[in-house]
Amino acid sequence: MTRRCSSFAIILTLTLGAGLALAQQSPAPQTDQPPPGKIIFSRDLNAPVEPQPTNPAAPPQSGSLAVTDAERSAIAFTAYDLDVHLTPASAAISVRASLTLRNDSAAPLTRLILQISSSLHWDAISTRTLPSGPTTPLPFAAHLIDTDADHTGRMTEAVVPLPQPLVPGASVTLTALYSGSIPPSAERLTRIGAPDDQALQSDWDSISPSLTALRGFGNVLWIPASSPPVFLGDGAKLFQSVGLARLRNSAATVRLRLAVEYTGDPPDAAFFCGLRQPLAAISDNANLPEAESPGVATALFDAQPLGFRSPSLFITDRPASQTGTPANPNLIAAVTDHYDALPAYAAAAALVEPLLTDWLGPQPLTSLTILDNPGQPFEDDALLVLPMRAVEPATLAPALAHSLAHAWIHSSRPWIDEGLAQFLSVLWTERTAGRAAALAELQDAARSLALAEPELPDSTLSPAGTSLATATTDVFYRTKAAAVWWMLRSIVGDDALKQALQTYRLDPRLDLDPIGLQRTLENSSHKDLRWFFDDWVYRDRGLPDLSIVSVTPSQLTSRTGLPAGWLVAVEIRNDGFAAAEVPVTVRSTSASETQRLRIPGRSSASTRIVFAGTPAEVQVNDGGVPETQSTTHTRQLLLPSH
């Protein structure tokens, strides 16, 4: 398959998460053998609870099985129940996955499409026709196809015929066995010309004794997916595909039973979908020296909502070091051997903590966990993977304001979760460099947003991925959302927004309500915000397009006939579809007067401002409201002579 890429540097910058891959390991075949006395993980195909077919699957073929992208896009995963067994010494993985799939297409499905990394292979797939009945083995064919959704640049795709068609809206549960190895690989980048070292800075997913890092769809297909092939050189389609998959599967539940083989010191903890569980170690032979003693470490992650993420798994080999501030001494848990970096992170946390406590409340909900790993960063709420180094606290503070926001407030809604964290980063800029610097930051971000927004948005609910409530790309759920938070601050005021945020974060029921945030803000501000949420959150109206139609200054006189200032009438046109509430400012050389004005989409509005001095200029919008073109509009005044 032919693919074109104009610049590897651009692709490397865009790659999903990233970092330096771990040292190359040669995978060797290995049979899973739990320690005697306790079964930690079993793939017994004759097990009475879930009997599986004993005939091994044929190896995947490179030829096409004539699968359509419509078939690949037809299903949503609504439940993952995973038994995962890892052997880090050989990068080996074997999985028993119970998958509940729903037909989200408009037509019945006669077969299902399941995909895993090309370094893995399907062993068996079965289903139950009755809830309490025996499992029925399903025949399937597997082939290899190119895709950059996996770091190897390929995936193993299984085509599974169904005993009977799956009608639209119906669900089916399959049990799939698959295995293989996940060593470091950056094949998708090196085959388009990337130097090995730079490629491995981006694609660092692997299973190894020092760190197991599996970031999921878009990086490594370690659990089954179903999506059309996408490529890094084809615009932003890979990243859009990742976002759509996250949205489609966000309501799923995930459960994991994990077993990790080890020799010597056991691994310390596992992080699944951003949550931590300690690993309980069971030694296979206590009579051997500790450095030679094999064992199995286990962890259980109970069923939980997946949310807007690709399921990820990290396993660390050492306990975290705690650091923080006097008020929150365990604010940061860092798994690192760069202990000299801890004081810098503690000092940076102390710098941004007053901002976070002022806006969100005195105590975080969780610690921020940092896994020290060379390469580009990866973030999943309050889990951060990045290279830790001893640098100036002021250098760390802007990014830490964003990351620590995830420790203070959690939301299942990406535009709240990520947008609010980005908004707090802008507030940090305002607090340290001034309002003009914060507005300049917003204006820079608005340029990329203007390119992404449609010129003629639909007047009804937008398709998933464009309205902020269902956004799937970061230009919306992070960039646009930060601007939305800034505008809400301008509309309701700091105190009302702080009160709403502190109420919202402590009541999970509000996050479950699609309009819970709107109601909370309306209660704290005593303002009707439906117009704003309709145009900026629930629908995608695009961006405003403002212009100054006219400015009419009229001199005022006192009762004695002496000049008493000016009345400046300003008419503003909005040629965009989204309503905007913007500041309208009249200035002289020494003073200014500002009023806020709401201009509905495709409409005009006017205001009159009384100005005590001699007006010289009118400005509409200060850069805080993103627009399709310029985000500030000025007009110099020519005063009438008397």
Predicted regions span which residues?
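N-terminal, polar/Ser/Thr-rich
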Residues: 24-94, 530
